Amino acid sequence: MKTFVRRYYVFAAIALWAIACWAFFQFWYPYHFFFQEQNQLFLWSSDYISSYLHPFRFAALIGDFLTQFYYYLYVGAIIQTACITIAGLLVYQAFRNFHVARPFALAISLALMTFVAVCHFSTSYRLSSTISIMSWTLTLWLVSLVYSRNKRLTIAACNLLVPTYLLFGLPEIKTIQKPDFILEKDFAVDCEYYFGNHDKVISIVESSEEHSSQMLFFYNLVQAQRGQLPENLLKFTPTDLGTFYKIGPETPMLTIRNMNELYWALGDMTFTERAAMMTNVFSHNNRNVRMMKRLAECNYVSGDTLAAEKYLRILDKTFVYHRWADNVRAHGKDIYRSKMEMVNQRDTITIGDNAHFLMMQLLDRNPDNTIALDYILCSTLLLKDIVNFKRDYDRYCTDKNKPRLKTLYQEALCIWLAGTNAPKEEWMKYIQRQDVLQRFQQYNSQRGNPAFKDTYWYYFDKIKAPDV
């Protein structure tokens, strides 16, 4: 029994480490894999693959090839753990060939594996760096193998370092850091929204104790598409609608990615295409398969079938998304019929990122675009801009005889009516919810009372408006 333990405890320790590593990344850090898969593009074409045939690029070729399979559940953690474990086993065998004692060789192996795993806590750390480390550990193992059999040839075997360097280059090394579980939550809501799991987005946000702007952006985006943005706008403060975003040199990558989702939901294909292009620019190697899909979609919806086909042909050369491209060609009109009805067909020139003007254009084209309506009204309310809220409410609700009797809007109208000393007829015209009117009277007798934290009146009096 002791002989058995001495013989196999090393591999048992490495196997247990590998299981723990896989479990951690699969169950506590899975969305990092989806994020990396979506932020690259790998094509099965000779022209594309030939772009990797340069010094130091072979690790990138293998890494990007394997990363595309992160699309599939469980596969990302399996690939990453397998690569790290192989590197660890090679290091262990190499040091054993150099006659290092088993416990020390095992300690070195586990230390390397742990360090590489920690590097993967960073989203910017690519699988190609781990592939590069594997190549160097393989070279070390080959040199050690020669050393164990013929020490005189060891120096000659060291010549393997040159081709290894030319093929794989040097790996990127990250500083020691903790897992970023806040960023993982950001990726979670982003990916679940992308996958169409809107209920899960709401569940993640509402069950979290802390909320980032990314989480609240997608929470509001889901609620808007369900027609429930006014009911949930003030559930978490400060909140984030995305309508005040500006693209510039200091704009975070996640913010740039979010903008195309906002414009797509609103129905503006020109701004969707622009935002998708910007995301491509700031992605890994300026390639982003998720944005390729979005560019195909927005051009298809806007009627530019030639441009859409250009992106669909690119996706035809991917392993994962070629079926998606075929489905768009076959059923695109049915899939995007409702989106086509929202599109602004007028020729307009828009300068800058003025989301308010953009939403006005969309509503002038289609007054039934409730997503744009709620976003334009809620945006002005977040800024406490009651005058412009009233103007937009009249233009798109009152004047069209389609009052949107949401509690939030009724509460905001109470503020405008009270502030302008409106006559009774105006109150009767705008305030059609008697429960809101009664509560407004109660609030006026105890302004700022936390018992009214769920009202717009409390927000208007007590909460700081976002800086624009």
Question: What are the residue ranges of the model-derived segments?
Answer:
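Soluble catalytic regions of membrane-associated enzymes that act on cell-envelope
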Residues: 178-344, 348, 365, 369-383
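Membrane-interface coil-to-helix junctions
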Residues: 22, 26-66, 70-75
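Internal/C-terminal transmembrane anchor helices
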Residues: 154-177
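Membrane-helix interface and helix-disruption motif detector
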Residues: 65-78, 98, 120-132, 151, ...
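Start-transfer (signal-anchor) and selected internal transmembrane alpha helices
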Residues: 1-20
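Transmembrane-helix motifs of polytopic, lipid-linked glycan transferases
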Residues: 81-99, 113-116, 137-144
